[in-house]
Amino acid sequence: MTKFIFVTGGVVSSLGKGITAASLGRLLKDRGLKVTIQKFDPYLNVDPGTMSPYQHGEVFVTDDGAETDLDLGHYERFIDINLNKYSNVTAGKVYSHVLKKERRGDYLGGTVQVIPHITNEIKERLLLAGESTNADVVITEIGGTTGDIESLPFIEAIRQIRSDLGRENVMYVHCTLLPYIKAAGEMKTKPTQHSVKELRGLGIQPDLIVVRTEYELTQDLKDKIALFCDIDKASVIECRDADSLYEIPLQLSKQDMDDIVIKRLELNPKYETQLDEWQYLLDTVNSLDGKITIGLVGKYVSLQDAYLSVVESLKHAGYPFKKDIEVKWIDSSEVTDENVAEILAEVDGILVPGGFGFRASEGKISAIKYARENNVPYFGICLGMQLATVEFARNVIGLDDAHSAELDPNTPHPIIDLLPEQKDIEDLGGTLRLGLYPCHIKEGTLADSIYNETEIEERHRHRYEFNNEYREQLEANGMVFSGTSPDGRLVEMVEIPSNDFFVACQFHPEFLSRPNRPQPIFKAFIEASLNHQQSK
C-alpha cells in the first residue's frame, strides 16, 4: 500500500516547504524506500510553460515532456530521481480537465461543483503519482500558505484522502516560521499556533511540525508548540537557516524525522540511516578552495530563479575541482560590440542559456563573437546554440543578415527555422518539442570525449531548430556538427575545434545534473574555464 505525506506551509510564503519535502524524500530513499514527490500549485495557469520567467522563474522539464514548477528541479536533485507529468498539478490543469469532462457530458447533466468534482480530480492525480511510479511513499507539497483561498480545494482533497485511504496511510507535515523579535530578545510561537489553528479549522491535524528559525529552538519552546498544537514533543522539528541547502537533510536526520515518519506510517525500510554520500557532498561544499567566474549572458538576469537549474549545474560541476562557481550576471540588453570586451574581461568562461524572443538577442551574439574570437571557453544552451550558429554565419561566412526566423521572420538567411511539425501549430502552451530525446554523438569530436558514448539522451524544450540548408557552408568554414538526432535530421550539438572549448547544444543538460553526479558537459565547461583561468 502506497503511503502519502502532505507538506503544507503557514505564516508566510517561501518558508522552504519544497526543500523540506525534498530532504524528507532523500532521507526515506536512503533508507531503501521507493519515493516519488509532487507539487500542487494553486494558480489557474494549466502549466508554467507560457508564464513569464519574471513571474515564475525557470520552467523545469521532465523526461516525459511536462513543463513544471522549478521546485521539481530541487526534488530531482535532492532525491536523485526522475519525475513525471503527475509530479506537478496546477489548479488550472484540474479545472480544465473537469470542464472538458462536463462539455463531453461525462457528469450526465449533474451540477459540477468544487466538492466533489474538483476534489475528486485532485485525488485522482494524487493516486496516479503513486501508481505511475509504484512508489512506497508519495510526498506532496501544497503550494501557497494555509488559509489562501486559492489552495482551499487542495486542502479539502488531502483532508478527504485520509478517510479514503485510512489514517495509517496518510501523514501531514506542516512548515511554519518562528520569528525572532529583536527588541524583546525572544522567539514567538503565536504565529505557529494560529497557523495550526487555521489548518485544524480546515479539518487537518498535523502529525509533525517543521519550524523554520534563525536560532536554536529550546526544549521549552518545543514543549510549548507541542502543547498548543496537540502533537508529540518529538514531532516538533527545528529547521535552522543554513549556509548551504545541502545541510537540511542532515539537520532533519539528526532530529530523527525519518524515524518518526517510518513509525507513523508503519513503513518497512531496508536500511538504517545512510547519509555517508550526503555528508561527503556537504564536506566538499564546505571545503571549496578558490573560485571560477562564469559570465552568464541572458535577458532575465534580474530574476536569477529564471536560470536556477543552470546555476545549480555549474555549482555541481565545480565540486570535483573543489572550486566555488561565481556567476557574473550579465544583462544581454546592455551588451554591444563596443563594450563586450570590458564587460567580459574578467570572466573565465561564457555561458548563454536558453530563452525566447528577439529582445536582447544581439547582446548575446556579441558575447558569443567575443568568446569565439578571444578563445574564451563558451557553452551555449538551446538559444545559446542557435545564436552561436547565427554568429558564425554572419562573422565567419559573411552572411550579414543571417538570423533566426523566430527573431527575424524576414531574414534572407534563416539559419534557425521552425521545426517542420511546428508549422501549423497555433497554440503556445504544451506544443514545443519537449522531453527526453536521443542524440547521436559524432566520433572523434569534443562531444565524444565529453560523453564517452555514441548515443545519449537529454531533455529538450524548443520550437526552432538549425536549418540544414546551411549545414555544408558552416562545416566548410570550420564548425562541426557533433551531435544530431539518430536519423541525422536535427542538429543537437555544434563545436568549433579551432577553439580550446566552444560547444553548444540544443538540449537542456541542466535538467539532468545532480550534486553528486555533475552533468558531463557542464563538468567539461568548468574544467576548460579553470584551464583558461590558470593560463591568464
UniProtKB/Swiss-Prot annotation:
<dbReference type="Pfam" id="PF06418">
    <property type="entry name" value="CTP_synth_N"/>
</dbReference>
<dbReference type="GO" id="GO:0019856">
    <property type="term" value="P:pyrimidine nucleobase biosynthetic process"/>
</dbReference>
<keyword id="KW-0460">Magnesium</keyword>
<comment type="pathway">
    <text>Pyrimidine metabolism; CTP biosynthesis via de novo pathway; CTP from UDP: step 2/2.</text>
</comment>
<feature type="binding site">
    <location>
        <position position="13"/>
    </location>
    <ligand>
        <name>UTP</name>
    </ligand>
</feature>
<feature type="binding site">
    <location>
        <position position="54"/>
    </location>
    <ligand>
        <name>L-glutamine</name>
    </ligand>
</feature>
<feature type="binding site">
    <location>
        <position position="406"/>
    </location>
    <ligand>
        <name>L-glutamine</name>
    </ligand>
</feature>
<feature type="binding site">
    <location>
        <position position="463"/>
    </location>
    <ligand>
        <name>L-glutamine</name>
    </ligand>
</feature>
<dbReference type="InterPro" id="IPR029062">
    <property type="entry name" value="Class_I_gatase-like"/>
</dbReference>
<feature type="binding site">
    <location>
        <begin position="240"/>
        <end position="242"/>
    </location>
    <ligand>
        <name>ATP</name>
    </ligand>
</feature>
<dbReference type="Pfam" id="PF00117">
    <property type="entry name" value="GATase"/>
</dbReference>
<dbReference type="GO" id="GO:0005829">
    <property type="term" value="C:cytosol"/>
</dbReference>
<dbReference type="InterPro" id="IPR017926">
    <property type="entry name" value="GATASE"/>
</dbReference>
<dbReference type="GO" id="GO:0005524">
    <property type="term" value="F:ATP binding"/>
</dbReference>
<feature type="active site" description="Nucleophile; for glutamine hydrolysis">
    <location>
        <position position="382"/>
    </location>
</feature>
<feature type="region of interest" description="Amidoligase domain">
    <location>
        <begin position="1"/>
        <end position="267"/>
    </location>
</feature>
<keyword id="KW-0067">ATP-binding</keyword>
<feature type="binding site">
    <location>
        <begin position="148"/>
        <end position="150"/>
    </location>
    <ligand>
        <name>CTP</name>
    </ligand>
</feature>
<keyword id="KW-0479">Metal-binding</keyword>
<feature type="binding site">
    <location>
        <position position="355"/>
    </location>
    <ligand>
        <name>L-glutamine</name>
    </ligand>
</feature>
<comment type="subunit">
    <text>Homotetramer.</text>
</comment>
<dbReference type="GO" id="GO:0046872">
    <property type="term" value="F:metal ion binding"/>
</dbReference>
<feature type="binding site">
    <location>
        <position position="71"/>
    </location>
    <ligand>
        <name>ATP</name>
    </ligand>
</feature>
<feature type="binding site">
    <location>
        <position position="224"/>
    </location>
    <ligand>
        <name>CTP</name>
    </ligand>
</feature>
<feature type="active site">
    <location>
        <position position="508"/>
    </location>
</feature>
<protein>
    <recommendedName>
        <fullName>CTP synthase</fullName>
        <ecNumber>6.3.4.2</ecNumber>
    </recommendedName>
</protein>
<dbReference type="InterPro" id="IPR017456">
    <property type="entry name" value="CTP_synthase_N"/>
</dbReference>
<dbReference type="InterPro" id="IPR004468">
    <property type="entry name" value="CTP_synthase"/>
</dbReference>
<dbReference type="GO" id="GO:0004359">
    <property type="term" value="F:glutaminase activity"/>
</dbReference>
<comment type="function">
    <text>Catalyzes the ATP-dependent amination of UTP to CTP with either L-glutamine or ammonia as the source of nitrogen. Regulates intracellular CTP levels through interactions with the four ribonucleotide triphosphates.</text>
</comment>
<keyword id="KW-0315">Glutamine amidotransferase</keyword>
<feature type="binding site">
    <location>
        <position position="224"/>
    </location>
    <ligand>
        <name>UTP</name>
    </ligand>
</feature>
<feature type="binding site">
    <location>
        <begin position="14"/>
        <end position="19"/>
    </location>
    <ligand>
        <name>ATP</name>
    </ligand>
</feature>
<feature type="binding site">
    <location>
        <begin position="188"/>
        <end position="193"/>
    </location>
    <ligand>
        <name>UTP</name>
    </ligand>
</feature>
<keyword id="KW-0436">Ligase</keyword>
<feature type="binding site">
    <location>
        <begin position="188"/>
        <end position="193"/>
    </location>
    <ligand>
        <name>CTP</name>
    </ligand>
</feature>
<keyword id="KW-0665">Pyrimidine biosynthesis</keyword>
<dbReference type="GO" id="GO:0044210">
    <property type="term" value="P:'de novo' CTP biosynthetic process"/>
</dbReference>
<dbReference type="InterPro" id="IPR027417">
    <property type="entry name" value="P-loop_NTPase"/>
</dbReference>
<feature type="binding site">
    <location>
        <position position="71"/>
    </location>
    <ligand>
        <name>Mg(2+)</name>
    </ligand>
</feature>
<feature type="binding site">
    <location>
        <begin position="383"/>
        <end position="386"/>
    </location>
    <ligand>
        <name>L-glutamine</name>
    </ligand>
</feature>
<feature type="domain" description="Glutamine amidotransferase type-1">
    <location>
        <begin position="293"/>
        <end position="535"/>
    </location>
</feature>
